[in-house]
Amino acid sequence: DLEWIFLGPGTTTYYIAKALAHRSSIHVLTNNLLVANALGGSPSCEVRLLGGNIHSEGLYTQPANLNAELKGVYLSKAFFSVDGVDINSGYTLSDLNVLDLFKTIYANCGRMFMAIDSSKFNRRAFMKLDNLDMQHSVITNDDPPENFLAFYQSRGVKVYTKSTIEKAQ
């Protein structure tokens, strides 16, 4: 509560927004039109949408001057999804615009979460976003393959899955 978080483009972050819709006193910065729609009608959520051109395929906005739009903005947490996760290639994306957004947000947030649905493991997309051992946490719907779990554990990357969250409740 009361933190400013960023929810990036993609359907995975949209589902995070839906899960947050019942929370009170949250503040969300996003460029994801689905996220803005999911949270925008809630009186207990403050939602700010980044301006700019709308990318209709991904349903997100891209500011003309990203650095100017985000100058002086600091976020407690940021949530991004990716198109592929590979042990050797790291996190990969299909959209160059998301790469610039990620790098800018990553530099201005306290804690980064990579939201990865289970279909993205052992896949590579067009371009590299970052290595798997970057400073972050992972959220996924199912347990990742064993080689990913071992990799993350050996580097101190916190992994949240449906089963670990259910155990904590």
Protein language model annotation of sequence segments:
Residues 19-24, 39, 43:
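Active-site catalytic pocket residues across diverse enzymes, especially alpha/beta-hydrolases
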Residues 33-169:
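Conserved phosphate- and dinucleotide-binding cores of soluble alpha/beta proteins
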